[in-house]
């Protein structure tokens, strides 16, 4: 009866977790461990994960593997390209650092999307822009979350141009940003941990901005009591 299944196929991140399916938490699925951290705090190996295509959703569901890491990485942050012929995702590289990769839906053409000479930079939670550029969350500030003594790195957003390799930081927040998403009007919606005008200790508000990082404004949740946190 679920009308969301009235389609030919869907693309999913698939994790084979055996008999512990009813007990898993975010750590077991390769994502951040709590509501203030980001992908740099997630486990970097030991997963049996893949990107898969599911079809025949109303009958005997068929599964086709699109991509499976050989290094035990998880495959979070799936984002389909506008042309629907490829997708981006996050995965650890050979140096065990998070990077943004792209693969075609037929499983070919795997490549890293963001190239930078700064080897300590990590990128994840990215999105395609209509201009051909990318926005990704990164540890570019090299700072930690203050209320946990810096034990979790802060992720702020960057703008990357694949044509010339230019990288520009867009946000300079004390705490993390998550889930940049292109809105119908071309602006970027995202969530941000907020310490200003908060009514709760744990506050994640929905923000929006222009793709170049200008006009960062609250979209939903600023000053409200409930819900006190939003997620992607």
Task: Report residues per predicted region.
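Multi-bladed beta-propeller domains
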Residues: 58-73, 104-122, 160-175, 210-229
